[in-house]
Amino acid sequence: MQNNRSLSKSSFFVGALILGKTTILLNATPLSDYFDNQANQLTTLFPLIDTLTNMTPYSHRATLFGVRDDTNQDIVLDHQNSIESWFENFSQDGGALSCKSLAITNTKNQILFLNSFAIKRAGAMYVNGNFDLSENHGSIIFSGNLSFPNASNFADTCTGGAVLCSKNVTISKNQGTAYFINNKAKSSGGAIQAAIINIKDNTGPCLFFNNAAGGTAGGALFANACRIENNSQPIYFLNNQSGLGGAIRVHQECILTKNTGSVIFNNNFAMEADISANHSSGGAIYCISCSIKDNPGIAAFDNNTAARDGGAICTQSLTIQDSGPVYFTNNQGTWGGAIMLRQDGACTLFADQGDIIFYNNRHFKDTFSNHVSVNCTRNVSLTVGASQGHSATFYDPILQRYTIQNSIQKFNPNPEHLGTILFSSAYIPDTSTSRDDFISHFRNHIGLYNGTLALEDRAEWKVYKFDQFGGTLRLGSRAVFSTTDEEQSSSSVGSVININNLAINLPSILGNRVAPKLWIRPTGSSAPYSEDNNPIINLSGPLSLLDDENLDPYDTADLAQPIAEVPLLYLLDVTAKHINTDNFYPEGLNTTQHYGYQGVWSPYWIETITTSDTSSEDTVNTLHRQLYGDWTPTGYKVNPENKGDIALSAFWQSFHNLFATLRYQTQQGQIAPTASGEATRLFVHQNSNNDAKGFHMEATGYSLGTTSNTASNHSFGVNFSQLFSNLYESHSDNSVASHTTTVALQINNPWLQERFSTSASLAYSYSNHHIKASGYSGKIQTEGKCYSTTLGAALSCSLSLQWRSRPLHFTPFIQAIAVRSNQTAFQESGDKARKFSVHKPLYNLTVPLGIQSAWESKFRLPTYWNIELAYQPVLYQQNPEVNVSLESSGSSWLLSGTTLARNAIAFKGRNQIFIFPKLSVFLDYQGSVSSSTTTHYLHAGTTFKF
């Protein structure tokens, strides 16, 4: 059993099987955290997977009675306690059950069909009509059921390893976990075969594991149409196998929609003896049309394999749109590592609500494997887009080598497509010997309409026509953008590339010191090559600089010192000069306003003419023009997105927590020894000013205290409190979550027969802060942790104008409160991470002075009232100052800004009711208002007199 557990879990850790070697997903990959989480989730969601995989019943067992082999009767099993069928062979059709229509609904406990078999069709159940499996509460288990012949003439009809249904199968609204494990059919539908399969509205997870169809149709599911919809828990297809569609084969449309839970296809395999066209294809899914739309949850295809076409999906039409993250990783096929698109098809890939990522997908069209994500056959159109903040990322190339006449392949076609379409070879090993690992080939007309098209880290494009109707073309170090021929004529006549908004990824260039290349690629498939005098590249417009997030790079790269000869662009042209730069303005580098390092770029061209060497593509062209730039820094301008006001807000969070505690202590003088417990709530609103953003803070906590007094009514008190607070910065998504522990001591001394009193308080607090920051429209996320210590002291004097024996008295008072707060240095994690260290701590001296009034009433229950009004000036304040440094650029600045107004009005109110002579309940409120800050502090609790 332990070996089986390791086997099932390993499918999430293991990458593609490449040339007999296993690639393990390590931290260096873009999705390693995701796969680690999936591995942990598998055994949590499906605790019975190992038990069922190894279970072998020794005797027949069934809780089904009556006629179970009549295709003319309808069977309804509703509100059963449980349903079990073990090791049955009741009929040639349906080893455990055969009927006209079947409904299994509202079962309280387990549904189990285990190790039944049929010698013709449907290992467990055959349904001539519809099968409804809905609203069941316990586990649903179909395991080890077989549809295998005992004579060769039955082989082609052995379909539906567990279930065969002539019409529709609906699996819906089930709360329990569904297991379809180790079911097998000689022909098709390893687990389920039906006309239409609907898996929808389930709140329990579902697993199709290790099912197989020996023929050409659907290792787990085979149907005319399949719809997986609105499931709130994950659905897994793991280790299923068939000749076509390792997990699912559908004659028409396969739809994944509105699923908030993940839909995972992992380690499925399509292979049969015939490895020709229309065989051994679709490692996970084989269908005419595949749609992944409106899924908030993740859809992932990992480590699926097809011996022929489409390591993950083989289809004619594919649409991915309005969905959360969609991942294609470690898949492989002979053609189309992840996706194979059949003739006259269409592919739409829109990263609207989450990223679409292709990583480490391979195909084996020749002796050696190459990285390929999508392979388009003849007359297949391609549309790709990404919305703001998202990306369609291809770490493996796309192949569209067949020309579509009079059609533009649209990239970022819609106005909302302001995101990034990224082609990157960042994860291709430097040891790769095949240039095809890096090249995306488009023998068509590509149009960029919005957003950003980016080529990075050695990625290459070969494109017949390219037009920039909008958006930005971003090129990084060692990227190549080149011409190619048309498929039908095998000629480059008419090949034109028009680029009018070019951006260079400056941090990438500074890291490798190699410029991206625009190239009139030579003709010829092998040596000797020759210059191609047909294509034209028109480069126009201003040149700009960006970083990986399409932001100004002046806070991403270290530009504090002058830099000479920065390689910006390399034009590899033919002798006749077919790259036109007459309307290209590199001087545009100095026209944009930006934050970060300020300075001046001095761009210049260097032109070199060489002798043609026809033995290599790279040495054929003779005209080399290289654009360089010299950088001269002039200063630094802090970007408000990076400024870091949120770190100062943590100081004020600690200050307000302790200041409110010290102000509250003046009300705590008790004549008799007491113990109290209370709930507390604190609200603070700090206005923004020209120097810093404001914030609002909410804190909830509790307090425990006790007081003791002497015969002369001198009292001593101690208080322990904890506050859990959240601070939210104004006009941003930055926040601070804190946990504060405070200990306070108080001494009260009455004098002159209690008409004059003095008190002193001392408080210390310790706070843990978790700071989260978000910037650049959510593109950048950082977080950090630190702690702070705050020390405060208060002295107060009051004079009662009337004796305490009177029902009403007034008491003028004056109080001095001093607070010091400091916090530790810390470093954020994430993109554009910063380091923070304290330059100056916070000091504050406030002197409230005002008047209190107290009275009591004894209607039914003794009740005491106390109100206070005070003027609250700040006599001394040292605002905190923090040194901030930005790791990505090496820049630093001093942060200071938020301040309290010098004058405020404070007010308090207290109501205490004695339910019993020694037990009272109370409600306190105190607040303050100034031009900068508003505070509200609430207490509700009980006091017991000893």
From Swiss-Prot:
Alphabetical keyword list: Cell outer membrane, Cell wall, Membrane, Secreted, Signal, Transmembrane, Transmembrane beta strand
Topological category with respect to the lipid bilayer: Peripheral membrane protein
Localization per Swiss-Prot or TrEMBL: Secreted, Cell wall; Cell outer membrane
SUPFAM superfamilies to which the protein is assigned, alphabetical: Autotransporter
Predominant subcellular localization, coarse grouping: secreted
Signal peptide as annotated in the record: 1-16
Pfam families associated with the record: Autotransporter, Chlam_PMP, ChlamPMP_M
Autotransporter domain residues: 668-946
Keyword tRNA processing part of the UniProt annotation: no
Gene3D superfamilies given in the database record: Autotransporter beta-domain
One GO CC annotation: cell outer membrane
Record-linked InterPro entries: Autotransporte_beta, Autotransporte_beta_dom_sf, Polymorphic_membr_middle, POMP_repeat
Family: Belongs to the PMP outer membrane protein family.
Record protein name field: Probable outer membrane protein pmp18
Phylogenetic lineage: Bacteria, Pseudomonadati, Chlamydiota, Chlamydiia, Chlamydiales
Name of the gene this protein is made from: pmp18
